[in-house]
Amino acid sequence: MRTMGRFVAIFFVMVAVPTVATTPQEPPLTVEVRHYARSLQPGEVVRVTATFSRPVRAVRAAAFGSVVPFQPTSDQRIWSGLVGIDLDVEIGEHLVSILGTSPDGTTARTGHPLAVKSKEFATRRLTVAPEYVTPPDEVIERIQREGARTTKLFNTQTPTAHWRGAFLRPVTGEATSAFGRRSVFNGQARSPHSGADFRASKGTPVKAPNSGVVVLANDLYFSGNCVIIDHGLGLYSFFAHLSRIGVSEGDRIASGDIIGDVGATGRVTGPHLHWTVRLNTARVDPLSLMAVLSNGG
């Protein structure tokens, strides 16, 4: 009977203790960040890539005081964004702050350093019509109005990307006036050259470097006939001094579409194509954008 009693007691204990199923915990969410650029200097574009240990549903990032939109790959683990280093940036170390959030609400945060180095820009001296150095009183209001409009456009960050892949060269001619050169017109210093000039004869067709939406197609006092394309996510192309505008505001254009012809309108010394790029308001070199996005953009 004792043996039976022990057996019953043991059996009771075994059935009284339930089996607890343990769910394996997710490993901590981590992130590794890398960047690619021609150099870390004023006017350069930097592609920043964040690789998370598992898929995330959202990434928030910022650099140089601006929000930096990040886009995911198909598996939501790898996200990337473009950072612009403005011409007037303070030299030294800056951080790209990145915050990723997984579907279950887990977050991973990091600050990726970008050590910006100084760059010397050459000076160009040009002679232009006097009214483009000291504009007459009757056009001052026009200049201010046009400046306010373009500033508002460049400050607008469209939430979706219209562009895809590498950016094309808008004309085949070589670059003749480098980005960032200090400009002296008729002996008077003016703002730096915030674009790149390309050699081309009057009437040469200008191709859209990538897809986007035309947000300005008009004649501006200093820029002449010009076209601004919104590529999305704070990225804009601005083409100036055209002899002909071939698109209208609101047009959706594809990479390679003809947007106009090279000319010599506005403040110029001769026919050429001027291409400015703005990235989240930063003035950046179009050639830097082309280089970064041609390398796995």
Question: What residue ranges belong to the model's regions?
Answer:
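N-terminal edge beta-strand
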Residues: Q25-G43
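Surface-exposed, glycine-biased beta-strand/turn segments
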Residues: R34-H35, T110-S223
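Aromatic/hydrophobic beta-strand junction motif of beta-rich domains
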Residues: E44-S53
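Short, surface-exposed loop motifs enriched in S/T, G, D/E and P with embedded aromatic residues
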Residues: V67-T73, L114
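Ligand-binding face of N-terminal immunoglobulin V-set domains in extracellular IgSF glycoproteins
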Residues: W79-S97
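Beta-strand-rich extracellular modules
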Residues: L99-P103
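Catalytic cores of peptidoglycan-degrading enzymes
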Residues: L168-G297
